[in-house]
From Swiss-Prot:
Gene Ontology BP terms: endoplasmic reticulum tubular network membrane organization; endoplasmic reticulum tubular network organization
Post-translational modification Phosphoserine, affected residues: S284
Regions of compositional bias (Low complexity) in chain numbering: 253-270, 297-315
MF annotations from Gene Ontology: zinc ion binding
Organism: Schizosaccharomyces pombe (strain 972 / ATCC 24843) (Fission yeast)
The name this protein goes by in its record: Endoplasmic reticulum junction formation protein lunapark
Coiled coil ranges: 12-42, 99-127
Cytoplasmic side: 1-40, 100-334
TM regions (residue ranges): 41-61, 79-99
Gene: lnp1
Zinc finger (C4-type): 201-227
Length: 334
């Protein structure tokens, strides 16, 4: 009589949800497989049947005898026969598409039933289970955002990203078989998303738009809109010395002004201080004490922008050689 007092076995929500999840994945895979098969079958049938029928009609028309006495009637009959054959091929293509659509609708109905069953189990789970156990199961098997919500969020993210093209906001039209033929003849569209690399942040892995056509995503420098992190190759801040020399040569007047300011600061008026550093030449005659004549100082020619040889290196070298030749006794006292 022990079986009479046994408790009723509780419903296993976790196992049932696992089983439904596997069935949902199989149903979704079946839908994707049917759609891809439909596109391949229709494309191959359209191209192959039309090419074979056209070649066969051309061979038959060239080798067949005149059906009517008037040649114009014969041409009209062959053209009408060709059009009738093309129409029959199109009707057969429509029948194939209808059969694939029936399979696709049946698979979608199965997916809809599985989703409804999963929703019922989730509703029962919310009313029976404890809070923490329910929360864990809902996070694992809860319903994901719908397709419409995903499209709205993707559109808002594309508008907020400055690098994304304006063509991505336009509605996507289904690609037909003649679009593929034109892409093979003319070339792919440069603005298409399939021909441009996505900018994925290396830190938070968020989408930051698309790179330009022909440009690699690893060569694009940008700041992530979500984590504000820097992405792309680092910027080389060091400049070569040739660029610095060219910048100095473009403004020689500033160099001459800096030289004058340095000479005024180092040489001050005093009884034992000379006004400017001079080189003492042994061959120069010694002035007598009684004579008060003073030799006029030659005006120093400042650097001008017209002199082609003026550069920062030449000015600094000449200044240091003159300063080094002055005796220590003539240096200004503080």
């Amino acid at each position: 009589m022990g079986w009479f007092f046994q408790k009723k076995k509780e419903f296993d929500f976790g196992g049932e949800l696992d089983r439904l999840e596997m069935k949902l994945e199989e149903a979704q895979y079946n839908i994707d497989n049917i759609q891809s098969q439909k596109k391949k079958i229709l494309f191959r049938y359209t191209v192959c049947s039309l090419a074979i029928y056209t070649i066969g009609m051309a061979v038959w028309a060239s080798r067949s005898s005149i059906l009517f006495q008037h040649p114009l009637f014969s041409k009209l009959f062959r053209i009408s026969l060709y059009i009738l054959g093309v129409f029959s091929l199109y009707m057969f293509r429509w029948a194939i598409a209808w059969f694939c659509e029936k399979r696709l609708s049946r698979a979608r109905m199965n997916l809809h039933k599985l989703n409804a069953e999963k929703r019922k189990i989730l509703d029962a789970l919310k009313s029976r289970k404890e809070y923490f156990e329910t929360q864990a199961l809902l996070e694992k098997y809860g319903e994901q955002p719908t397709l419409a919500q995903k499209k709205l969020s993707n559109a808002a993210a594309a508008k907020s990203v400055p690098g994304s093209s304006s063509s991505s906001s336009d509605p996507m039209h289904p690609q037909h078989w003649y679009d593929r033929v034109l892409e093979g003849l003319v070339g792919a569209n440069e603005n298409s998303e399939n021909n441009r690399e996505a900018l994925i942040c290396s830190h938070c892995f968020h989408h930051n738009g698309l790179a330009s056509y022909g440009e690699k995503a690893s060569d694009v420098r940008y700041v992530c809109l979500f984590c504000k992190a820097w992405n792309g190759p680092p910027i080389d801040k060091s400049l070569p010395s040739s660029e610095m020399d060219s910048n100095l040569q473009t403004n020689p007047s500033s160099i001459s002004k800096g030289k004058k300011n340095n000479s005024n600061n180092t040489t001050q008026k005093g009884p034992n201080i000379i006004s400017s550093p001079q080189v003492i030449n042994a061959s120069s005659p010694v002035r007598k004490a009684g004579k008060k004549k003073s030799k006029k100082a030659l005006p120093t020619s400042p650097l001008s922008s017209s002199s082609p040889d003026a550069s920062y290196n030449s000015v600094s070298d000449s200044f240091h050689t003159v300063a080094a030749s002055v005796p220590e006794s003539l240096t200004p006292t503080k």
